[in-house]
Amino acid sequence: MSRYRGPRVRIIRRLGTLPGLTNKTSKLKSSSINQSTSNKKISQYRIRLEEKQKLRFHYGITERQLLNYVRIARKAKGSTGEVLLQLLEMRSDNVIFRLGMAPTIPGARQLVNHRHILVNDCIVDIPSYRCKPQDFITIKNQPKSETMISKNIELYQKSKVPNHLTYSSLEKKGLVNQILDRESIGLKINELLVVEYYSRQA
């Protein structure tokens, strides 16, 4: 299944607020589940499916990519669900988004694809590049890159940068301090349901 490129508001009406996908909010929110099913009993499969879809659309990844991340998480030490979230959160496009350098993850992905971003002084043009603790993220030394990202920071870095990251406006540099903990996830999600959804596939 390819990456979603359709109307974003339609998705958040069904699944609720997904800050990585869009900074818009839906008046209907995820209560649409209750409205659409009225008195019908919601199947456990559907609940798991919708949690999985939240992850897919929030992080802007394909079905195959998400399945691969689940497989990697299963082989790692610790809670599969927590490791899965850590893998997704440490993607370069998500780190740029969480630093406030882009309004959404698709916006951050575009910055990476267009080679505006450096990690440890090297251009990174792969959105799935996995950042590590002590990696530092800077802007390409070109007026276009600096102007664009400075504008984004001014407009979108409203909420506090999560504890596992630091951004210096003076140096125009972001730093990955550590692997994030569960409380720092910027999404309301039950990752265990996602792991259960893939239990027969991963």
UniProtKB/Swiss-Prot annotation:
GO terms for cellular component: chloroplast; small ribosomal subunit. Disulfide bonds: none annotated. Gene3D superfamilies: Ribosomal Protein S4 Delta 41, Chain A, domain 1, RNA-binding S4 domain. It is found in: Plastid, Chloroplast. InterPro entries: Ribosomal_uS4, Ribosomal_uS4_bac-type, Ribosomal_uS4_N, S4_RNA-bd, S4_RNA-bd_sf. Residues 90-158 form the S4 RNA-binding domain. The keyword Cell membrane does not apply. GO terms for molecular function: rRNA binding; structural constituent of ribosome. Its main location: plastid. Keywords: Chloroplast, Plastid, Ribonucleoprotein, Ribosomal protein, RNA-binding, rRNA-binding. Transmembrane segments: none annotated. GO terms for biological process: ribosomal small subunit biogenesis; translation. Belongs to the universal ribosomal protein uS4 family. HAMAP family: Ribosomal_uS4_B. One of the primary rRNA binding proteins, it binds directly to 16S rRNA where it nucleates assembly of the body of the 30S subunit. NCBIfam families: PRK05327.1, rpsD_bact. Part of the 30S ribosomal subunit. Contacts protein S5. The interaction surface between S4 and S5 is involved in control of translational fidelity. This is Small ribosomal subunit protein uS4c. The gene is rps4.
